[in-house]
Amino acid sequence: MPGSVPFATPHAPLARHAGGWGFFVQMFGYGKSNECRGVRMGTPTPIQPTVWVGRVRRFFPLRWATWTSTEGVIMSEKIRNVALVGQGGVGKTMLAEAMLHLSGVTSRLGGHKGTKPTLDYDPEEEKRSFSIKLAMAPVSWGGARLNVIDAPCYPDFIGDAYAAMSAVETAIFVVDAAGDPGAVTTRLWYAAEDLSLARAVFVNRIDRSEAQYDATLAALQERFGQRLGAVTLPWGVGEDFKGIIDVIRMKARHLDDAGKPVECDIPAEYADAAEEARARLCELVVEADDELMLKYLEGDGQLTQEELEGLLAKAIAERIFVPVFAGSCTAEEGVTSLMDDIATYFPSASDFGSVPLVNGDYLDIDEGDDRPVAFVFKVLNDPQNGRLALAKVLAGTVKPGLELICARTRKPERLAHIYRMVGRDMSEVPSAAAGDIVVVPKIAAMAGDTLSVTGKVEAAAFRFPNSLYQVAIEPDKRGTEDKLYSFLEKSCDADPTMSVSRNEDTGQTVISAIGEAQVSVLLDRMAARAGVTAHIVPMRVPYRETIRRTASAQGRHKKQTGGAGQYGDCWLRLEPNPGAGYEFVDEVVGGRIPKGLIPAVDKGVQETMREGVVAGYPMIDVRVACYDGSYHSVDSNEMAFKSAARLGFLKAAGQAEPVVLEPMAKLMVTVPEDYAGSIMGDVSASRGRVEGMEAGERGTTVIQARVPYAEVVDYATRLRSLSRGTGEFTLEIDGYEQVPYDVQAKLAEEWQNRRNAGR
C-alpha cells in the first residue's frame, strides 16, 4: 500500500522503551555486581524494586540493561512463556500455527486449506477435528524466545490447559469475534487469576462477515471487568478486513503480498476510533505508577509515547491491564502485532521472581543458581518418541547428563538428553536456563513432580479439575484383562485427570475422568496401540443389605451317604447392629456344640452374608449369636456346621425384616446463581434433599445436598447439561440409608432374574 514501510522481521529486535525488561535481582539481594553468573552487564544495573503480585514476587527494572551471554544460552529475561487458552473451536491452534509460520519455523500455515497441521498430529485429533492434548510451539521473535503452549480447551481435556498455565507467566485467551466468550473461557480466566498470571485476549476471525469486535470487547469487559482495553483495532471487518490499527504505536499494520509485516499511517476514517482507544489505554496503564498518575490527572490527560511504553510492561505483569488484540489467524493478520507485544511488553520468566514451595518458602527463578531445579508439568506417552516429560527449569541451568532427584519418590532421574519440541518434532539442545521449557525423554517423573539436586525442593502443586466422571469397562475378549489394566495404568500415570481402579465392592474396572470424550479417546488409543478392545458397561452401585428386627431360627444339616455322614445343628439369633458392622457371639453352654466347631458356624454365617438374602448384596450391621445346637460324635465336622449355619441364617434373616441399603452421596455443587434453581429441582427429582445453600465466589451459588449415589453416578454429564458447562461439583460417599420399597422390589426382581439365568 502507498506509504507502507517494512516493520519488523522475525529475528530483528524491536526498539526497547526506557522501562523495558532488565536484568533481575536475587530474592534476598537488592543488586549484583556487573559481573553476574553467565552474564556481563554492559552498563551498571540499578537496584530493582520488588513487587508482590498474588502468589509470586515480580521485579520491575528501572532501565534497560544490555547483556551478553558468555555461554550462548537464551537468558531468563529473554524468555516469554505463554499459554493459548479459551473456548474450544475458536482458533487457538490456528493462532499457534500462524506464529510458527510467520516466525519461519514452518514453511506453510499448518491446518489451513488442506495443509497438514503441525500441532494436532495425533490420529485421534485428526479423527475428531479438535485438540486433545497440549502442544509446544516455540518461536524466536523480536529478540526473545516465545515458548507458546497450545492448550486444548474442549471441556473433557481442560486438564491440559491447567497444566499449561502452571508453566507460563501469561495466559492468552482466544475468543471468537462473533460468539460468546463461553463457560470454559470463564473457568480458565479465574484459574489464571488464581495463578497470578498476566492475561491478554486475542479476538479472532475478524475477517468473517458476522464479526463484531466492539460488541465482543464489551462482552468481555462486562464479564471480566473494565481493566480490559484494546491495543489493536480491526482495520475493517468481514471481506473488508485489511489488517489492524496499532493503538500503542498509532500506526496501521498489515501483511504485504509476500506475507511480510508492514506499517503505514492510520486511515482517516479510523483516526477518531484510534485516538479514543489510545486515551482509554493511557487511562488504564497509568494506574501502574503513582507519580505518572498524578501527573496524568493534573495535566491534560495525556502520556508521552515513552511514558506509555514504559508503563505497559508493568501494568500487564501486575494485572492492572489486560491487552486485547484483533486479528484473523487464517489470514495471519494481527498475529505479528501480538508477537511483537509479547516480546516487548509481556512478563518474562525472571519477572515472576520466585515460585512458592510446599514448605512455605519461595524459590528464586535464577539462571545463575548452581543447583538446578526443574518442574514437570505434563507427561506425554507418544508412540513415536516414547514417554516424554515436559518440564520448566525453575533455577540454574540444565544440561544433558544431569542427574536430579525427584521430591516425590526420592529417586534419581537422569536427564540423558533435553529437547525442544515443535508439535511432534524434537531437536536436542545443549542446555536450558531458568524459565525455559524443555522436553526430557525416558524419565519416570509425573506431572507435578519437582526435580532438584537434593530432592528436597518441591514446588507447590497446582490443582487439576476434579475427575468425577466414572465408567466401568470390560474387555471384549477374555484373557486380556491384565493387558487392559496395564495400558490403562500407564496412560493414567501420564494424565493426572484420569485414574483407573478396581472397585473392591463391585469387582469392576472403573475409569475416572473429566468427561465422556476423554474416556472414548483412551479406549480408542488402547485399541490402536495395545491391540486391546473394551466396552463401557453400567456402573454397579455398591448396595448393602441389613435387618430391621431380631429373629431366631434353627439350622440343621443332616446327610447320610452310607459311610460317614454329615451332621450339624445350630440355633442362631440375629439382631440389628447399626453402625457396628458384623459381630458374632458364642452363647452355647454345656457343650451342646464343641468349641472347635463354633468357628465353622461363624464362617458359614459370614459366607452367607456376602451373598445377601434380598437382592444379592453383602449384608452389614448384623449381630449373630449362636446360643444352642447339637452334634454327632462321628458325623459332625466343619463342613456340616458351615452348612447348618447357612440354613439357620437364611431362615432367621427372612424373619428379621431384611432390607436393602443404598450408599448416600454428599454432593456440593457450585454454579452461577442463574442455574441454582435447576440444580435444586434436579436434586429433588433424584430422591435427594438440599441441606444448604450459600453465596460462593464470583457470582456463584454453592448448594449442599444429600442424594442417593445411584442417582448421581452420571452426575458429571448431567451437571454439564444443567449448567451449560459452568458448574463444578464434589461428591463423596456418606453412609447408607434404606432404599424405598419399590426400589427394593425392583432390585430383588433383577437378582432373581440373574439367578434364573445362571449368572
For each of these PLM feature ranges, what is it?
Residues 34-37, 48, 59, 63-759:
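Structural and coupling elements of P-loop NTPases
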Residues 18-19, 243:
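Coil-to-alpha-helix initiation sites in intrinsically disordered, low-complexity, charged segments
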Residues 5, 12-15, 43-44, 48, ...:
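Short, low-complexity intrinsically disordered segments enriched in A/P/G/S/L with frequent Arg
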Residues 5-8, 12, 18, 25, ...:
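Short hydrophobic alpha-helical segments enriched in small aliphatic residues
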Residues 21, 28-30, 46, 53-56:
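Low-complexity, intrinsically disordered Ser/Thr/Pro- and acidic-rich segments
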